[in-house]
Amino acid sequence: MTKYALVGDVGGTNARLALCDIDTGEISQAKTYSGLDYPSLEAVVRVYLDEHQVGVEDGCIAIACPITGDWVAMTNHTWAFSIAEMKKNLGFAHLEIINDFTAVSMAIPMLKPEHLIQFGGAEPVEGKPIAVYGAGTGLGVSHLVHVDKRWISLPGEGGHVDFAPNSEEEGIILHELRAELGHVSAERVLSGPGLVYLYRAIVKSDNRLPENLQPKDITERALADSCTDCRRALSLFCVIMGRFGGNLALNLGTFGGVYIAGGIVPRFLEFFKASGFRGGFEDKGRFKSYVQDIPVYLIVHDNPGLLGSGAHLRQTLGQYL
């Protein structure tokens, strides 16, 4: 008889829940709920379990915020809860709450070739460290290492490292953003809001007044080639994505590959392919040869957060991935 676990991927707006086959890792019965409609995460879980009538005693839910202890307070939502109390209330034997990019990193061993698009480099080296990052509402970062037949995710807040420009144009961007924001992290330029900041900085550096644009507006105008400033912003975004990925590769020697997740890049995939992304990735001066063979992949799986939550839980329960 198939045994299922509950898996989830929770952001600031929506909570996506599903069932995971503990033996195979297969994800099924996925459903998305609006977080605005429920007073707590536990309430959403109860609705899902009532709707599906499956006996579940184990769960793993990925959440877009730092997980540092039993108390979880979402940074982009009003939900806050005790993991131990929620586990007790639901009657679960196991309940894991993990960072969203921990989940994405744990999905990588489960991905198939059709879930990936490669951008340069050679083949990944088996057993070597892996980096994963992705731009969305913010900039998520994680690493993955293989130790004693187990995958270990190394979570952190790498998106908040300093923005490190490496060209005259990028230096001008930093100057403009520092005047507006004070501290300028990588996330301030590599995210949806970051694309807007890039556009604004480009326009303001030319002593002009920027329009009040949303990330979608900038992307659409760039792809239509109807706005030079928007196209420059999107081009710069791609190059800086490359530089940041190359930095991750250097930090941990990620010869197992660098993986890009998040919802932004797939929206302009052809533009990204033709951009200066790979050039930015390899632009490491004396260490260019070190990163040249490291492959970069774009994850095109529909929901790596659910897949990775399931993988994390299965490994916790003693399975080998």
Curated annotation (Swiss-Prot):
Q: Where in the cell is it found?
A: Cytoplasm
Please list the GO biological process terms of this entry: glycolytic process
EC numbers for this chain: 2.7.1.2
Question: Where does the UniProt annotation place the signal sequence?
Answer: none
Keyword Manganese in record: no
UniProt keywords, alphabetically? ATP-binding, Cytoplasm, Glycolysis, Kinase, Nucleotide-binding, Transferase
GO CC terms on record? cytosol
Which reaction does this enzyme catalyse, per its entry? D-glucose + ATP = D-glucose 6-phosphate + ADP + H(+)
Q: Which SUPFAM superfamilies match?
A: Actin-like ATPase domain
* Class of the enzyme per the UniProt entry, highest EC level: transferase
InterPro entries under this entry? ATPase_NBD, Bacterial_glucokinase, Glucokinase
The reply to whether Signal figures as a keyword in the UniProt entry is: no
Specify which residues bind ATP according to the UniProt entry for this protein: 8-13
Q: Molecular function terms in GO for this entry?
A: ATP binding; D-glucose binding; glucokinase activity
On the tree of life, the source organism's domain of life is Bacteria
Task: Name the protein family.
Answer: Belongs to the bacterial glucokinase family.
Q: Which PANTHER family match?
A: GLUCOKINASE
Name of the protein = Glucokinase
